[in-house]
């Protein structure tokens, strides 16, 4: 099972549980305070997931390491490729 399928299954399970609880399909009579928390729950979860994603990206950008050796190696490979292409008749 792919990761997308796992996420879709989890989303379908959570969504159907939320819908069943809020619409009263299970026959459970939830107190009013629970229903007031349950209705906006998907929006809260979406905002929480967005904050987590933004924090994760920010942390990864802040702790990104420069790879100076790899950059030098890549630059030398580019120079070799340019020299080879120039030798074969390509003009830059």
UniProtKB/Swiss-Prot annotation:
GO terms for molecular function: enzyme activator activity. Pathway: Protein modification; protein glycosylation. Belongs to the DPM3 family. It comes from the Eukaryota. The lineage of its organism: Eukaryota, Metazoa, Chordata, Craniata, Vertebrata. It comes from Bos taurus (Bovine). GO terms for biological process: dolichol metabolic process; GPI anchor biosynthetic process; protein glycosylation; regulation of protein stability. Keywords: Endoplasmic reticulum, Membrane, Transmembrane, Transmembrane helix. This is Dolichol-phosphate mannosyltransferase subunit 3.
């Amino acid at each position: 099972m792919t990761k997308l399928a796992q996420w879709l299954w989890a989303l379908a399970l959570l969504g159907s549980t939320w819908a069943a609880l809020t619409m009263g399909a299970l026959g459970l009579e939830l107190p009013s305070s629970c229903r007031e928390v349950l209705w906006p729950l998907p929006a809260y979860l979406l905002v929480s997931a967005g904050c987590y994603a933004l924090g994760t990206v920010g942390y990864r950008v802040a702790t990104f390491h420069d790879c100076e050796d790899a950059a030098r190696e890549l630059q030398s490979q580019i120079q070799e490729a340019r020299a080879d292409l120039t030798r074969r008749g390509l003009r830059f």
